[in-house]
Amino acid sequence: MAHDPAADSATADEPPVLPTDRHTGCPFDPPAGLTALSDRPVRRLRYADGHVGRLVTGHAEARAVLADPRFSSRYELLHLPMPMEGAPGELPPAPVGDIIGLDAPEHTRYRRLLAGRFTVRRMRQLTSRIERFTTDCLDAMEQAGPTADLVEAFARPVPTLVICELLGVPYADRGRFLGLVEVIFDQAAGAGARDEAYAGLLRYVGELVLAKRAEPTDDLLSDLAAPGPASDSGDLAASGLSDEELAGIGGLLLAAGLDTTANMLGLGVFALLVNPGQLDALRADPDLAGAAAEELLRYLSVADPLLRSALEDVEVAGELIRAGETVTVSVQAANRDPHRFPEPGRLDIRRRATGHLSFGHGPHQCLGQQLARVEMTVALPALLARFPALRLAVPPEEVPLRERSSVYGVVSLPVAWGEEQR
């Protein structure tokens, strides 16, 4: 029989709030308070506005929630588990083209249009270009050395170049969109600033869509924006998407495609540098790059949490989640579930880490996950091969962290390599 929290007595323990403080302990570990709450896979949680919903920390339970259509992704149904500066009491519906905040059938329509363009085969076809971008960044870094901020010199430029190439965004325009993306993910920025940044990104991509329709090139935006036979007015592309939808989808792909991978690369190199045994193993055997990428994705879990709303009463792990309750799925906790990953707090690049939830699960699983995998698999061994003596230029505790961002990572990563570089 499911446990019904509504039947609890008035003297029941007050539900905890979501722990987010990483100030103490290892910068790669979940907050200590979150680990303490992971003794039960599903528990009650108090949200920033006072709503009482659920926290899911178990790996199997997280997969079940993320795959179940009885849990909605619609923003207007959700409550925020942590306070965000200036966030409204009630969230508005997803903007046009934002497929993350939609359910079927709207989400299914967008997903079908895009999924075929992000297959494993198509992403692997980009490998040679990713290798070229990586080499160019390493050349520039080496010439400017022997010290660098790895974020500015490598972790951010590589995925920016790649997503620009894929979408058809001029890399020379990065000054127009990089700052906007930073604000969009900044939880400490006011709601007005985030909204203004998002609107600015949509304006930029909207201008690009019109340019692509007039003069198409070989890229994803041109493909999606190509006019249909009955769309002389430009109201609908052959893909069936309006200009507003194209701008929303393009903005989402641009922001997600560069920010998450950039933070994975920066934080991933940081994790390797403070785990020299793992770093040496990867340097000695570049064929471990694929397994290393999966393990770093599991170990670091930079995009967390994922939110859902129960559309009806649902039982998960013997707990009855009531219709209308928001469910916070902690990717960090699920990826450290010892029932799924033995010794989960240990970085082990030889581990079989497939099955982690860093790209989500179910119908909203990340479209760009194969691209991120290829980028990491190419970039990490190339960096270590180029700079055999790569090391932190500051003590680990002095590396600044992005603790108030929706995507966790390092603000900067000062590194040096010295005379042993090739």
Model-derived features: positions:
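Cytochrome P450
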Residues: 1-422
